[in-house]
Amino acid sequence: MSSIETLQSVVARAVLTTEPTDVLPLLARGRFDPARRLNIYRNNTLVSLTATLKAVFPVTVRLLDERYFCYVAGCFIRNNPPQEPRLSRYGKDFAAFLARFEGTAHLPFVCETARLEWKIAEALDAPLKRPCTLMELYDGLSSGSFALFLQPSLRLVLCRWPALSIWAAHQQGGDADRLAGLNREPERIALWRHGEAVRFLRLDAAEFAFWHMLIRGQGLEAAVSRACRHSPEFDIARALTGLFVSELVIGIHRIKECSNQEERVS
C-alpha cells in the first residue's frame, strides 16, 4: 500500500473512532488544534451519513424515535463506512444490523420495515425500461415455451411481520394508531418503480412463487409449475395479464427446446 493510501486509511479509521491517537501526529498544526479540526470533520461525516440513513429509512425513524435512531445510526456508521461514493446506495446492511443490535433485536417488526424501506430505495434508484405489450406477446409467441424479462426495479420481499401495513400506516393519510394491536403476520410484497414513485402489490404464496421464478430468469412454464404447487387453481391468464398491465415486462424470449437457448422476440 502506498504512503498516501496508508494515510487515507488511517484518517478514515480515525474519523470513525472516538480516540484517533494514531493519526494526530500526522496532522500539521495550524491555527486550530489538530484534534479539534479532526473532531469537526468527524462530526460532519457522522451528521451527513446519519441524514442519509434518515432519508432512506423515514418510517424506521418514527418507529424508533428520532433521537434513538440517531444513536443506532452512529453505531452502524462506525462499523459500516460507505463502500462507494454514491450515498444513495448507503444503508444496504442497516436492516441486518438492526436485527443483531442489542437495542433493536427484540423489535423484529422494525427490522422488517427497515428491510422493506431499503428495497424501496433500491427500486427508486433502478432504471426504467420500455415495457412490452400483450400484443407483442400474442404476435411473437404463437407456440413454444418462453421467458419474460421484467423491470430491473422489481423487488420481491417476504416479511415475517406486516411491514407494508406498517409502512402504509405512516404515510400521509395513514392511521398509525391502528397498529397498536400489531400481530405477527407474514406479507409477500412486490414493489417496483413507477415514474418517481413506487407501486406495491401484496401477493399470495402462488403468485409470489410465480414472480420469483420469472425474476430468476426461468421460463413461463417453470414459473407456472412452481405456482401450481402452492395452488392448483392458479390463474395463469390473470397473472400474466397483470404483469403487462403493470408495465413490468420488458423482454420476451422464446426458449428453443432442442438447444435450451433463448431467442429474443421483443
Predicted regions and their residues:
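Hydrophobic packing positions characteristic
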Residues: 79-206, 265
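A short alpha-helix capping/helix-coil boundary motif
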Residues: 36-38, 189, 217-220
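A broad, structure-centric signal for solvent-exposed, well-ordered loop/edge residues
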Residues: 18, 22, 71, 163-166, ...
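Short loop/turn hinge sites at secondary-structure boundaries
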Residues: 17-18, 173, 217
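N-terminal, charged low-complexity regulatory/assembly segments
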Residues: 1-129
